[in-house]
């Protein structure tokens, strides 16, 4: 897990920016569409690097035990996803509570994010690229890491409920945002529960995608 975090940081903070600079691009001077494409390529690179690390580290444990990285279109996992969606308002409520408990630290005013700038500018191409990042890329690789790998790994050392909670806490902390810890922990528990019930990683991916889409659409209001 530490190796994955280090790889994620190295790729996103150093390798991709270095390659972009070597190619003659500067993120600060890119257009809305350029920044959106940059974010998409960065996310894809981080995801592929993380999956490659997992593939390499799990090589000596193959064949993997049943239940690891299970994908299945069949079954009643749609009902589990639907139930998870019903909890979205509670996640939203926890987000507001968390923000009230952890106000922004004093210091320089943080600028508007590139996502918000694209939404304000109503650039359809940039918004579509960001939509792919948050509803496709992020759910796939985050669920592979936290529900596909970490949660089953933790069940070797603790009961399933504690494994779900621990993987949810790791999921929240990996976002490096104190103002979002409470909703992300709860969301991680919900997605972990959906995965545990359905034994299907596709279920938690779809739920994750729907939540991210819900947040993205809320930003567009």
Where are the regions a protein language model picked out?
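Hydrophobic alpha-helical transmembrane bundles that constitute the permease/transmembrane domains
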Residues: 10, 43-48, 141, 161, ...
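Alpha-helical membrane-inserting segments
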Residues: 11-24, 49-57, 90, 94-98, ...
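Functionally important transmembrane alpha-helices
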Residues: 161-221
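Juxtamembrane helix-loop-helix connectors linking adjacent transmembrane helices
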Residues: 17-44, 58-138, 156
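Short juxtamembrane and helix-loop transition motifs at transmembrane-helix boundaries
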Residues: 141-150, 166-173
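Solvent-exposed interhelical
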Residues: 152-164
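Hydrophobic core segments of transmembrane alpha-helices in multi-pass, intramembrane catalytic enzymes
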Residues: 46-50, 130-133, 184-191
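Hydrophobic alpha-helical transmembrane segments
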Residues: 2, 40-41, 78-85, 128-132, ...
